């Protein structure tokens, strides 16, 4: 199951050529239940669509946010993996989902803005929430070596300034077939299954199947609600001085 949690510019359903009648904004408004908006995509993947371009979806109150997560806890569907696709940056919404996740996978390109965003996210999660383990996906690289070099660049910075443990999860090649798949509104692994990006993504999926499940309660949606209610929003906390 995939939650499109880029709550301001959600578009997973559009990219896959699916038509979502209702979305998370209708759930928040009390017009329907979460189970009513779930749509099925390729290979049986279930998708929870968000509301693209709706400002209040990107600025949920703590009460709305908690209610939304409780709705996830009430789902009866059998879920193998629950993937949360967040926006870039360090908004409270991104941080909340990251804190609830069992594994945090950071997708980064070899560009200054992408590297800066990745480091900023790891910095806040490490220093403010005591999260040290991050999986890195080097995206749109020209070779495995370029992806490895990007990972080493990130590792050197985090080792110097943060108490963080990074793992290179995958290197996804720069592949024009990804763009072509988006134009066709299909998954690249479906439209072009034997291309470099598709093979790399399949390899990442197989690798994810072997990731160990932590023994602590983190990663459960009910635990997410508890954490959300215990921690104050960052805007209410005293600023942290460097």
Where are these regions (language model features)?
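Short beta-strand "acidic-cap" motif of Rossmann-like dinucleotide-binding folds
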Residues: 1-4, 107
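Residue-level signature of catalytic and energy-coupling elements of molecular machines
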Residues: 4, 12, 27, 48, ...
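P-loop/Walker-type NTP enzyme "switch/lid" segment
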Residues: 5-77, 182-187
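Short, hinge-like loop/turn segments at secondary-structure boundaries
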Residues: 17-22, 124-125, 152-155, 188-189
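Conserved catalytic-core segment of NTP-binding enzymes
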Residues: 81, 86-180
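C-terminal boundary of histidine-terminating zinc-finger modules
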Residues: 182-201
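Extended, charge-rich low-complexity interaction segments
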Residues: 196-212
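A short, charged, Gly/Pro-tolerant segment at domain boundaries
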Residues: 216-242
């Amino acid at each position: 199951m995939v939650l499109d949690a880029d709550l301001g510019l959600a578009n997973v359903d559009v990219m896959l050529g699916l038509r979502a009648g209702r979305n998370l904004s209708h759930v928040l408004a009390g017009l329907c239940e979460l189970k009513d908006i779930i749509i099925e995509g390729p290979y049986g993947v279930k998708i929870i669509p968000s509301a693209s371009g709706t400002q209040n979806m990107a600025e949920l109150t703590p009460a709305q946010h908690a209610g939304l997560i409780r709705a996830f806890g009430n789902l009866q569907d059998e879920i193998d993996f629950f993937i949360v696709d967040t926006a870039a940056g360090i908004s409270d919404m991104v941080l909340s989902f990251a804190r609830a996740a069992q594994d945090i996978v950071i997708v980064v390109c070899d560009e200054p803005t992408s590297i800066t965003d990745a480091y900023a996210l790891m910095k806040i999660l490490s220093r403010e929430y005591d999260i040290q383990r991050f999986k890195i996906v080097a995206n749109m690289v020209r070779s495995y070596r370029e992806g490895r070099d990007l990972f080493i660049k990130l590792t050197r910075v985090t080792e110097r300034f943060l108490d963080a443990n990074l793992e290179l999860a995958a290197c996804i090649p720069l592949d024009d077939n990804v763009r072509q798949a988006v134009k066709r509104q299909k998954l690249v692994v479906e439209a072009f299954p034997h291309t470099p990006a598709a093979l790399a993504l399949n390899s990442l999926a197989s690798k994810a199947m072997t990731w160990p499940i932590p023994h602590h309660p983190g990663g459960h949606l009910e635990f997410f609600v508890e954490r959300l209610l215990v921690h104050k929003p960052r805007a209410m906390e005293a600023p942290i001085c460097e």
